[in-house]
A protein has these predicted regions:
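Structured alpha-helical
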Residues: 1-109
Length: 109
């Protein structure tokens, strides 16, 4: 069954920094590629997995978006990490616009 999203999702190609906790007192920060984004979440590609449910911070263009990992799927060049943004840090075009952004609602096949 296909899910219908309530908001537009945008494909993009943007370098981002991703931070998450890897223990009770240590966090890890890695470079990532922001693959897609919408008001409530996005997908980043990393070289290593992040456990589902982990608190995560995605930063690009000087803006930070907090959230939780919803999925982590192995791909050919790393892992695709789905992030649901926290209600107090939603994304909008007014905050940060990724490079090469394509609105999937306007793509026809």
């Amino acid at each position: 069954m296909h899910q219908r999203r309530m908001e537009s999702r945008f494909l993009c190609a943007e370098l981002a920094r991703v931070s998450w906790m890897v223990g009770p007192d240590r966090h890890q920060t890695e470079e990532a590629i922001l693959e897609d984004i919408c008001a409530t979440g996005g997908c980043v590609q990393l070289e290593e997995p992040i456990p589902v449910g982990s608190v995560i911070m995605v930063t690009f263009r000087g803006q930070r978006f907090d959230g939780r990992v919803r999925y982590c799927v192995s791909g050919e060049f790393g892992y695709f990490i789905g992030v649901k943004f926290a209600a107090d840090t939603p994304w909008s075009r007014d905050l940060a616009v990724p490079d090469h952004m394509i609105n999937l609602d306007t793509v026809t096949m």
